Amino acid sequence: MTISFPKSSHPTGLHFFTRNPHPKKEDHGDCGVRALSLATDTEYRFVKHYADDAIAQRHDGDQPVWGYKRLQTSYGGITRQEITTTLNDMAKSDRKLYDWIYVSYKTVFHKDNLPEICIADQDNHVVCVKDGAIYDSWDSRGKTKKLKKVIGVWCHRDMWQKFMDKHNRDLRTAGVVK
């Protein structure tokens, strides 16, 4: 179901809604878990469980100088590979997540450059984008007219196809990428 909002006055064309699915409303480096939870409509604790497992498997305590707690939980951040692993692991028990993919493409953070429902990878932050609005615990759209860079998105394969069809399957000609 697509929700339509009035035109946004922000340079990104996106609206902002404060949403923090963390049970205690804490905000401490768990942007990947928040974005996954909000974009996939999956309960935060389930996403966190799978994310922590992906992080533990990837690091396996190989870098003790970073600190034990940071490496063992998603509160210390999560990499692109760990987000993809988390989605793949979640898909084993939730079929609707099976066709989520990561698409790498360089663009700017603007409504017209993103699929309707996706997780935008802003290099040092990931954020849930749904129907022309971002959903996060803080406003990551930026405070200046210069648009932030996006280096890729996670989205359902059907959303990506719809996005590509909207731009006649040529993102360069459509001005989405340069």
What are the residue ranges of the model-derived segments?
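Short, flexible coil/linker elements and helix-boundary hinge sites characteristic
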Residues: 41, 94-95, 110, 168-177
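Long, contiguous hydrophobic alpha-helical segments, chiefly transmembrane helices and signal peptides
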Residues: 32-36, 127, 134
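Low-complexity, intrinsically disordered short peptide segments enriched in small/polar/basic residues
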Residues: 2, 14, 131, 147-150, ...
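Active-site nucleophile-adjacent alpha helix/oxyanion-hole segment immediately C-terminal to the catalytic cysteine
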Residues: 1-75, 80-81, 175-178
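Noncatalytic regulatory segments and standalone regulatory/sensor domains
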Residues: 136-178
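N-terminal hydrophobic targeting segments
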Residues: 1, 111, 117, 121, ...
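Conserved active-site-adjacent core of cysteine acyl-enzyme catalytic domains
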Residues: 55-124, 130-139
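Intrinsically disordered, low-complexity regions enriched in Ser/Pro/Gly/Gln/His and often acidic
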Residues: 10, 59, 91-93, 147, ...
